[in-house]
Every structure is written in C-alpha cells, then in structure tokens.
Amino acid sequence: MNLIDKIAKDKSGLFSSGKGIVTFLNPYSYLVARKNTTLYESFDSIFADGALLSAMLTLLSGRTQRISFDFTSIAQDVFEYARSHDLDVFVVGSTQENVSKSVGVFRERFPGLIISGSRDGYFDSLSRQVFIKEMVQVQPKIIIVGMGAPLQEVLLKDLKLAGWEGLGFTCGGFLHQTAKFEGDYYPSVMDKLNLRWLYRMYDEPKLIKRYVISYPIFLVYFCVDALSSKLKRLFFKS
C-alpha cells in the first residue's frame, strides 16, 4: 500500500455510512504508518493532519485539506454530529484524570451530548480483552481513542474485527490537551498562521526532538512514495 494514495483530500462523505474507523497522519505518524501498512490498510479514512503534509499532497495531486482531531478542525464536526443525531460517544485515552476532565469540557461545550462512558488508555492484556468485549456488547455509536500511534490504531482495528460496528476516530494528544487548557488548545493566531507545530514545541518541549529528527526523514520518504505513486499511475492506469 502506498500511503499517499490512501489519504483523503477532504472530509466529504465522512458521516454517510455511520460506521468505519478513521485516523490522521502527520509527518511523524506517517513514518509510523509506513512500518505498519497492513494496519493502516484496515482504516476506512485517513486524513492529512498538519500543514506540511497537506501542502506536500496539494503540490503532488491537488488541494488536500488539513484535517485533524481537535477543535480547529474535525472534532467540532464529530461532536455536533453525535449531538444532533443522539449518538452516544465513548472516550478512551490518556490518564483517567485527563479523560475525566476532557469529558467535562465536551459536556459543557456540547449540551445534550451523550457520553456513555470513558476510561484511560492504559491496558494490560486482560483489561484490554474485557474492554473490547464490552464495546462489542454495548455498541457505542462513536468511539474516540487517544493513545498515540500506532496503539490507538491497533485498538480501533481490533474493535472493528471483534464486531463493533460504530464510527471510530483516533485523536492523538487531543484529550490531554483539552484537559490542560479546558477547551481550545491552539491560540487563534497560531492556528490562522498554520504555526500549530511551533506552539506544540513551546508547550511540549519533548516534541522538539521529534520535529527536528522525524520531519527531514519524512520529506525523504514522502518523495520516494510520491515517485512510486506517480510511476504506478503512469504504468498501471486503466
């Protein structure tokens, strides 16, 4: 699988079926995905999370929206969709303290939103099996998972394979960001200038190493994948 060919250009039709699993790639998780192609093939939708990946894809194959799971992007749509259709949401990830604070923010921000449950993202093998079995039994309509790549993707895939039939989203660090700032994480000026990456380095200095090391590597592999995609279309077009 060539990841470039799997990334959607926009969010049209996202809620049309009411089920499926959705994830998001930034330059760092793009490298993770390249090592786990079988895992990412199982996803119904993959979006470009971040201005750099979105810009690279736009240059390669036409305008590609930046779509991420936060309040500057698709999170607002997901919660509004759930509320307007009376769909229950289960939230899993981060620490118990953070997920509880996040749920409080969601309920305050979206009055009437049905949150049927939440739990932290730390499992042992037994508790993970119990959780998956419970989700299959109760069938929450939407599950949001914030455990970091690829753990969050593996959990959603396993839920789907076990028989859960709802709509699932990975959300990366969204839960702890929401808990920390009680709502919007990015200052509006940083969002408008597409400097969210810079703000994240300021807020979480541990990410500096990731940006400095991973992003140049991403550019190399993206160019390799872009060439592969172009050659595939050239020689195997119908």
Map each language-model feature to its residues.
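Short hydrophobic/aromatic-enriched beta-strand-loop microsegments
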Residues: 46-48, 67-68, 112-118, 163-172
